[in-house]
């Protein structure tokens, strides 16, 4: 969505300037994938597979079942990581998209006023 907002912003704000190409799209997609994998690495590193929650259960349906848990070194590490994810994966793109579309809105409003 961020890349779509950037493309729309560029085409409306600077129509004769930079135009995104297929190569730009592929580079943008590759960067997004690298960032997604990098931001998920702590989950991969701190995952623990255990049958601990099912050890005291007597139901046959839960025997031999396993669960993945996040086992960060401390609660402050987990809190810092999840807060960073929230900021980088939600608020960052949301603000960026908002700014792009706000600039588009201002430009289109000015064009409309010029035509009136």
Swiss-Prot record:
Membrane topology: Multi-pass membrane protein
Residue stretches spanning the membrane: 1-6, 25-45, 82-102
Localization annotation: Cell membrane
Keywords: Cell membrane, G-protein coupled receptor, Glycoprotein, Lipoprotein, Membrane, Palmitate, Receptor, Transducer, Transmembrane, Transmembrane helix
Extracellular-side segments: 46-81
The UniProt record lists the keyword Membrane: yes
GO cellular component, one term: neuron projection
Glycosylation sites: 56
GO molecular function: neuropeptide binding; neuropeptide receptor activity
Keyword Nucleotide-binding on entry: no
Cytoplasmic topological segments: 7-24, 103-116
Pfam families: 7tm_1 (PF00001)
Family from the record: Belongs to the G-protein coupled receptor 1 family.
Function: Receptor for neuropeptide Y and peptide YY.
Listed name of the protein: Neuropeptide Y receptor type 1
Species: Ovis aries (Sheep)
């Amino acid at each position: 969505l961020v890349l779509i907002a950037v493309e729309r912003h560029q085409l409306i704000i600077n129509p004769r300037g930079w135009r995104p190409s297929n190569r730009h799209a592929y580079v943008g997609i590759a960067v997004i994938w690298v960032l997604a994998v990098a931001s998920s690495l702590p989950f991969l590193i701190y995952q623990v597979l255990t049958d601990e929650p099912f050890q005291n259960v007597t139901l046959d349906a839960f025997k031999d079942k396993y669960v993945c848990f996040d086992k960060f070194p401390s609660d402050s590490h987990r809190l810092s990581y999840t807060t960073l994810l929230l900021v980088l994966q939600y608020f960052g793109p949301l603000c960026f998209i908002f700014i792009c579309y706000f600039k588009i809105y201002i430009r289109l409003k000015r064009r409309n006023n010029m035509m009136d």
